[in-house]
């Protein structure tokens, strides 16, 4: 596993699960609307910079360097909160997005079109208009 030097708090670093390149996904979400904006990659140092500067820093897998969202485009991400998921392998960064989040110039990277999917419906909750049999009996009468 590739690990670049980092100033990340060791207690936070110990909670992270990384891929073979020392990276983990970071989901950027608009803090006030819940809109999912983009997914980038971070390593320990990118997370440290994100936590300590108030700006999202990512690791570019193609350029092999750190980049601060909006540094050249002006489409900045201002950090509102950062949370680690239950498995420790993904972070959710809630941001105030200024301008486009996507490199295409779109607000979000997730507007390239819906995929055909079967839409599921949850079952009707118990007690939603019909009487259920008593526990341990077969169709108990009222």
UniProtKB/Swiss-Prot annotation:
Protein name: Phosphoribosyl-AMP cyclohydrolase
Record-level Gene Ontology MF annotations: magnesium ion binding; phosphoribosyl-AMP cyclohydrolase activity; zinc ion binding
Keyword Phosphoprotein attached: no
Cofactor binding comment, as recorded: Binds 1 Mg(2+) ion per subunit.
A GO biological-process term: L-histidine biosynthetic process
Keywords: Amino-acid biosynthesis, Cytoplasm, Histidine biosynthesis, Hydrolase, Magnesium, Metal-binding, Zinc
Residues that hold Mg(2+) according to the record: 85, 87, 89
Example of a GO cellular component annotation carried by this entry: cytoplasm
Enzyme Commission numbers on file: 3.5.4.19
Region annotation Disordered: where it falls in the sequence: 120-142
Top-rank EC class of the record's enzyme: hydrolase
Self-association state and partner proteins as the record states: Homodimer.
The keyword Lipid biosynthesis is assigned to this record: no
Reaction(s) catalysed by this chain's protein: 1-(5-phospho-beta-D-ribosyl)-5'-AMP + H2O = 1-(5-phospho-beta-D-ribosyl)-5-[(5-phospho-beta-D-ribosylamino)methylideneamino]imidazole-4-carboxamide
The protein's required cofactors: Mg(2+); Zn(2+)
Species in which this protein is naturally found: Acidothermus cellulolyticus (strain ATCC 43068 / DSM 8971 / 11B)
Gene: hisI
Family the entry assigns: Belongs to the PRA-CH family.
Domain of life: Bacteria
Location of this chain's protein in the cell: Cytoplasm
Pathway it works in: Amino-acid biosynthesis; L-histidine biosynthesis; L-histidine from 5-phospho-alpha-D-ribose 1-diphosphate: step 3/9
Function: Catalyzes the hydrolysis of the adenine ring of phosphoribosyl-AMP.
InterPro entries, sorted: PRA-CH (IPR026660), PRib_AMP_CycHydrolase_dom (IPR002496), PRib_AMP_CycHydrolase_sf (IPR038019)
Chief location: cytoplasm
Residue numbers binding Zn(2+): 86, 102, 109
